[in-house]
Amino acid sequence: MFYCREEELRTMNNRYKKGHFECVVIYGRRRVGKTALINEFCKGKPTVYFSALNASSQENLEALSKAIYTCQNPDSTSTPTYRSYEDALEAITGMAMEKRLVFVIDEYPYLAKAEKSISSRLQHIIDHSWQDSRIYLILCGSSMSFMEYQVLGYESPLYGRRTAQFKIQALTYREITEFHPELKAADQALLYGVTGGIPHYINKLDVESNLDEALLDNLFSTSSYLFEEPENLLKQELREPAIYNSVISAIAAGASRSNEISTKVGVESGICAKYLKVLLDLGILKKETPITEKPGKKTIYAIDDNFFRFWYRFVPRNMSVISAGRMRLIYEQAVKRFYPDYMGLVFEKMCQEYLLRYAKDLPILLSNVGQWWGTDYKTRREVQIDIVGAPVDGNEYLIGSCKYRNEKIGIEELELLRRYAAVFRQNGIFRYYIFSKGGFTQALLEAEMQGEVTLLTLEDLYR
C-alpha cells in the first residue's frame, strides 16, 4: 500500500507531463519511504531503475548495464556490460530519443563513492545532451549530508542542474492514522511513539487489532525484524557500529551535553563530536537549543528517531528476558507501566506538530514552535517550558504545557505556566495552552470559560 505522499507524487507527475528534461533529487533518512514514492511514480512509465551497490565501480557498471538492458529487452536472458559509464549514459540518451524515459539512480551516494567522477560525468551529459531531451532523471539517496552538500550544494558539479528536490520526512502523528484507522487515540499515539512515523516500521510492526500483542510478537522477540533493526542499520551505515551504539546508549541513559556523552562513552570530546555529527546526518540524533536563542552553551543532543529512542529505552535492559522468550510474562511491569513517562516527549512533539500544521484559529501567527529552558534567577532553579510558540512578528507568545498522564490537570498548572512565562519574557504578552491526556479539573475548565487558557485533550489533536 502507498500512503501519505500524495502531494509529492502529484508534483512529480505534473513535471512528468510537461515532457521536457527533469532532474529531481529525492533524499531523506533510511526507511522513510523514498523508494516507495519512486516506485509509485514509475508505475506505467518507461523506466530504467538502477539501485547502486555499496560495491566497486565495475560492479556498479555491471548493475547499471543490466538495468538498461532489462528495460530495452525485458525477455532477454543475456545482459552485456557497457565498456564505460559514458557508454551507459549515452545508451540512456538513445532510449529517450524514442519516448519519455524515467531514469532512476537510487542509493546515489554508493555510486558516487565507487565512481568518483560520476557527478562530473552526469553534469557533462546533462549540459550537452539531456538538457533538451525527454529524460526524467531521479537521483535518490539516504545520506542526507552527501545529498545536501555533494548533490545540492554550491560546490557540487550538479549544482544548478536540479529542477526539483524533495526531502522526505517521517509521517506526522495524524498521517499514520491511515495505516490503522481502527485504533483509538491512545494507541495511535503509542504507535507514533514507537515508529516515529516511519512507514517501514509501521508495516513491520504488523498491528492487527492489539498493539501490545504486535509489540510482543514483532519487536520484543529475537526472531522479529524490528528486534535487530537498530544494530543492523548501524552496521550497514557505519564502520564502527559499537562506538555509535555506545553514543546512542549514553544519550538514552540521560547524557545530553557533548562533554557528558564523551565521558560516558570514554572517548575524547573532539572524537565524540565526529560520531555525533554522523548520527545527526543519519537523522538518528538531533541538536536542540531553547527556542528564540542561538546555538551555544545551552545546546543539547537528543534521540530524534522515536524507534531508536523506544528500542534503546526498553530492549537492552530486558535483553536477557527477551532472549529467553519470556518477555510476555514481564511486559506489563517491565515495559507498559513506563509508557506514560516515555510518551511525555512524544506527546510534546505531537502538540508542536498540531500547532504548526493542524490547529485552526490560533490567536497568534506562529513562525516556530519549540521548547525553552533557562534559569529563574529569583529562585535559582531551572525552568522548562514544554511549548513556546514564537510569533512571526511582535511580542505575543504562545506558552504551553503537555501532560501525558491519566490524571486530570488542575488550575495549579496554569499558575505554574504564568510564573514560567515571566521568566521567559518579562514584558511579553502570553496565550496559554494546556494539553492533557487525562483531561482537566472543573477549576481549570472554568478558567478556560473565562478566556484565561485553551485546553486540549489527546483526542482533540486528532479532530
Which ranges hold each PLM region?
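Phosphate-binding site recognition
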Residues: 1-328, 332
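A cross-kingdom feature that marks ATP-driven nucleic-acid transaction machinery
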Residues: 291, 301-463
